[in-house]
Amino acid sequence: MRVLGIETSCDETGVAIYDDAAGLLANQLYSQVKLHADYGGVVPELASRDHVRKTVPLIQAALQEAGLQAQDIDAVAYTAGPGLVGALLVGATIGRSLAFAWDVPAIAVHHMEGHLLAPMLEDNPPEFPFVALLVSGGHTQLISVTGIGSYTLMGESIDDAAGEAFDKTAKLLGLDYPGGPMLSKMAQQGVEKRFVFPRPMTDRPGLDFSFSGLKTFAANTIRDNDDSSQTHADIARAFEDAVVDTLAIKCRRALDQSGFKRLVIAGGVSANRTLRAKLAEMMQKRGGEVFYARPEFCTDNGAMIAYAGMVRLKGGTHAELSVTVRPRWPLAELPAI
């Protein structure tokens, strides 16, 4: 069975084809980073228009990469939310229309479930149950996962997501959009503990996060010190260390609370090398395992949507004839299969 996956939730157009026997057959991705760079962030209207231009050519490229024709596709999966409503509608409309034209099932996929299941694309996929840390520009959540669709929210950010805090702090440091990865690169040149940032909400029980205060702390630190490149690198190091430590502390608590031995990290920030190293060290000491996708599957992509669509289709899920998207869509509302 082959599923075509379409991802258009924000500023990346992704199309992939997944075969339940042969694995990933094609993976095409177009990033809109250059389009939005001049504006310092994603402009929803521009994102939607670019998805209109790029989605169909990427579908054609994916079919060519896989050596397939339209009649070889058994289902079409598309991201139905959460995300930017206009961007979601582009992928959903194209995906639902293709499914209707090809007379195959359509599957509306939850974007964050796609991220959560992305490590399943690797050679050593995690087994259930596990704790999942979903960490991206729009979400920071700890989820107890006991099966597909069996998701219990353990904690989440009460304000900025971790990725959003990275991007905002990077902007304060004068870095271009998207600043998160650039901040991490700058942090590698920073002196450890020259500056020490707080670890928000780690001095109280619970698994919720708060990162907006770190941005304010960074702004004050930048204001009160010289603007040399070394000082900026030291501030970047202090900021990244604070975020990574906070995430690790909360993950440890979630594992203690659940009793699980496996940890999955997913979402764009899961590509951060410092975070990966910190959690790998923590899990080794605990005698557990940590799982994550390769970097290209951490950010938005069609492969995770195709895979999640395959899993949902096998579980009996398919979309209605109408096109419906959900810009806000709690993960816990998904049915278990």
Curated annotation (Swiss-Prot):
Q: Cofactors per UniProt? A: Fe(2+)
Decide whether keyword Iron is in the record.
Answer: yes
EC number(s) recorded for this UniProt protein? 2.3.1.234
What does the note accompanying the cofactor annotation read?
A: Binds 1 Fe(2+) ion per subunit.
Q: Do you know which Pfam families this protein is assigned to?
A: TsaD
List the catalytic activities from the record.
Answer: L-threonylcarbamoyladenylate + adenosine(37) in tRNA = N(6)-L-threonylcarbamoyladenosine(37) in tRNA + AMP + H(+)
Q: Which Gene3D superfamilies match?
A: 3.30.420.40
The record's subcellular locations are: Cytoplasm
Sites binding substrate sit at L134, V135, S136, G137, G138, D167, G180, N272
Which domain of life does the UniProt lineage start with? Bacteria
GO terms under biological process: tRNA threonylcarbamoyladenosine modification
Q: Give residues annotated as binding Fe cation.
A: H111, H115, D300
GO molecular function list: iron ion binding; N(6)-L-threonylcarbamoyladenine synthase activity
Function in brief: Required for the formation of a threonylcarbamoyl group on adenosine at position 37 (t(6)A37) in tRNAs that read codons beginning with adenine. Is involved in the transfer of the threonylcarbamoyl moiety of threonylcarbamoyl-AMP (TC-AMP) to the N6 group of A37, together with TsaE and TsaB. TsaD likely plays a direct catalytic role in this reaction.
The record's NCBIfam families line, in alphabetical order, gives: gcp_kae1 (TIGR00329), T6A_TsaD_YgjD (TIGR03723)
Protein known as: tRNA N6-adenosine threonylcarbamoyltransferase
Q: Which organism is it from?
A: Erwinia tasmaniensis (strain DSM 17950 / CFBP 7177 / CIP 109463 / NCPPB 4357 / Et1/99)
What is the name of the gene encoding this protein? tsaD
